[in-house]
Amino acid sequence: VLQQQDAAKIVANDGLGNPTLDTNQRQIKVLLRQGAGYRLVAENRSWLPSAGDVDMPCLADPLLDEGSIEINRGVLKVSLSYWLSCGSWGVSRDTYTFRWQQNRLRLIGWDGVEFMRNSGDMTERSINYLTGRQKTVTGGNMFEDVPAAKIKTRWQTLPPQPARYLDGPSLPSPQDWESVGANADCSQFHLYKNKESNT
């Protein structure tokens, strides 16, 4: 992950939240070993969110605060977390899974968990883009064990989706889950600025 270093994009914040907001753009690049060096196989310059957001100054860095990027056996996972120090009890974590196939990193799955910090009420969702199926689990609690009888699992078939890749033409952000269709019931995901970057 690369990040622009422009001092003008580190903005002072006089209100609630972080005292300074780093709005420098990030990009993600993926390189594979080739001979004695490496070759660039994918990149995206606008998908990853910046560390700070002037519209949500209480938002912690989505990538560095419990977020992560890992790659193993041709599978890349990018996790983004959403935690606000003010204005919301909600917390969410979104993990995007890409697989190296046909010389591109294809988005094959998405997993999301969201919970309330005050009650612990939790919802988990998972989408398999290869099968077009979504799993939704409700009734769980982040802070305590819940009897299995109270956990509800629902499976749904989503409308056909075009293949999406790390290097474009476009990647979904949480806003897009609502447009997947009313059956998807994904309207509660937290919003963030969709920025493209390539690995």
Model-predicted regions and their roles:
Residues 1-5, 76-78:
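Hydrophobic beta-strand segments that make up the repeating blades of beta-propeller
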Residues 2, 30-32, 171:
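Generic low-polarity alpha-helical segments
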Residues 5-9, 84-86:
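Short glycine/acidic-enriched loop and turn motifs that connect beta-strands
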Residues 9-43, 98-100:
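Beta-propeller blade repeat segments, especially FG-GAP/WD-type strand-to-loop junctions
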Residues 16-18, 55, 83-86:
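Intrinsically disordered, low-complexity segments enriched in polar/charged residues with Gly/Pro
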Residues 36-59:
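Blade-edge motifs of beta-propeller repeat domains
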Residues 60-199:
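Acidic, small-residue rich beta-repeat scaffolds with periodic aromatic anchors
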